[in-house]
Amino acid sequence: MQEDFVGQVAILNALIRRRLDHLLQPLALSEINYYYLMIIEKTPGVSQSGLATRIVRDQSSITRQVDRLAKQGWIEKRRSANDGRQSALYLTAKGTAILPQLHAITEQVNREALATLSIAQQEKFQQLLYDTRQNFINRK
């Protein structure tokens, strides 16, 4: 019997996170801090609250992880030009230098996860995931 949707998504999430952790280990990164770097790359100057919205994590978890990444030299916090009470987050030279490897790992895991699906199925699957995520976001 097929598992329910939530169970399937939970297992898929765990498998992808485990695979990412394995591939990121030689870079001294984990799937958690990897995703922070990818978001900061796409939105340089993002605030911690903006990061929390994109990653869907609580503010205290974001603060701890951002502080850890800054201490490790992957990102830097600058005072926001728009709001002096907030920090704007940017990749450091070290963080920028590792991006090609992070992109390659992302592509590898995407290929592995979707290997049994045709291109049309992959596109449909991604659209369904997006629609499902938007449904939850809009339920506030």
Q: How does the language model describe each region?
A:
Residues T43-S47:
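Short capping segments at the starts of secondary-structure elements
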Residues D21, Q25, V56, D67, ...:
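Residue-level detection of the helix-turn-helix DNA-binding "recognition helix"
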Residues Y36-L37:
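Short alpha-helical "packing" element that flanks the helix-turn-helix/winged-helix DNA-binding module
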Residues R17, D67-Y130:
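Charged, amphipathic alpha-helical coiled-coil/dimerization segments
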Residues M1-L27, W74, F136:
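N-terminal leader segment of winged-helix/HTH proteins
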Residues Q48-S49, S60, D67, S87:
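Residues within helix-turn-helix
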Residues A52:
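The alpha-helix within a helix-turn-helix
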Residues M1, F5, I32-N33, K94, ...:
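N-terminal positioning helix adjacent to the helix-turn-helix/winged-helix DNA-binding module
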